[in-house]
């Protein structure tokens, strides 16, 4: 069986190749030559129609597997070009893409192909949004100081209403949404899970000496992976704690930028130095060397 693995590669030089590698994985690289609107692409998501949406430093791109279509926010009040410097995205169940940019937040309706600017009713307006998570009617925004801002979305007034919640304005190391729409926040001393009704549960932070820069929570298997300083820590989630299972060391890998699940035991690891496939059952990994001249980091979309 063949698999398509699209790696969103952030390039400072352009180089393109499509090839087959071990285990029949086909790697496809999208660059300016295929119509990407900017060589710096930061984030990638998939909608329920199968389209891939790529956020770049010059607008939004839709990839259908063959062609790329570009979208640029030209709405009145959008501070160009900073509003089109897309830093992160998330998509809601109704097909709305929520976009965090270098100049605030806006949405894009994939059904009508229209942008809508949103105003946050606090001091976060017109500031860079580094991380964005949608949780039903709520939105989590991470600012440049790694602090979280929680809002309720008012679609009629195109506003974000601040929510008084314990997570607000607290510094974090990373934040993650699991497959049940629970949001996991990692700080220096604890891990907080926030459920869709905004109730919370706290866990003691695992004894990891370094900052945790990336996590994956798999609620179907109660497994948790934490990435810190080029190491991946394997845990099982029990009722009140994380139980340590194992650790994988990726030699000379300073930053792990993304983790995606493929099967119960197989995970794709995106790093500054290339792409790895990790099997947590036997704690082995394979390196997939991608033919890119200068590579900064990976975001992964595996199907």
Q: What function would you assign to each model-found segment?
A:
Residues 1-303:
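Carboxylate-rich, polar loop motifs that coordinate divalent cations or form catalytic acidic clusters
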């Amino acid at each position: 069986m063949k698999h398509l693995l699209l790696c969103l590669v952030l390039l400072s030089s352009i180089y393109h190749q499509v090839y087959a590698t071990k285990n029949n994985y086909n790697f496809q690289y999208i660059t300016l030559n295929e119509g990407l609107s900017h060589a710096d692409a930061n984030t990638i998501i998939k909608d329920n129609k199968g389209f891939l949406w790529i956020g770049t430093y010059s607008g939004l791109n839709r990839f259908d597997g063959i062609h790329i279509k570009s979208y640029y926010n030209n709405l009145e009040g959008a501070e160009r070009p900073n509003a089109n410097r897309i830093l992160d995205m998330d998509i809601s169940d109704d097909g709305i893409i929520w976009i965090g940019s270098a100049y605030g937040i806006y949405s894009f309706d994939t059904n009508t192909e229209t942008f809508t600017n949103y105003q946050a009713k606090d001091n976060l307006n017109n500031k860079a949004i580094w991380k964005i998570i949608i949780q039903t009617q709520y939105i989590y925004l991470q600012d440049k100081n790694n602090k979280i801002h929680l809002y309720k979305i008012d679609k009629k007034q195109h506003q974000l209403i601040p929510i008084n919640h314990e997570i607000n304005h607290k510094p974090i190391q990373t934040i993650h949404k699991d497959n049940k729409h629970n949001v996991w926040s990692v700080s220096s001393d604890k891990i907080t899970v926030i459920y869709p009704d905004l109730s919370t549960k706290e866990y003691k932070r695992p004894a990891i000496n370094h900052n945790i820069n990336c996590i994956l929570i798999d609620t179907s298997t109660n497994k948790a992976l934490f990435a810190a300083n080029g190491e991946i820590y394997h845990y099982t989630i029990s009722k009140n704690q994380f139980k340590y299972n194992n650790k994988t060391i990726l030699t000379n890998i300073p930053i792990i930028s993304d983790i995606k699940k493929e099967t119960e035991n197989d995970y794709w690891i995106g790093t500054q130095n290339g792409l790895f496939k990790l099997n947590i059952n036997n704690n082995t990994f394979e390196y997939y060397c991608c033919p890119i001249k200068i590579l900064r980091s990976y975001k992964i979309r595996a199907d």
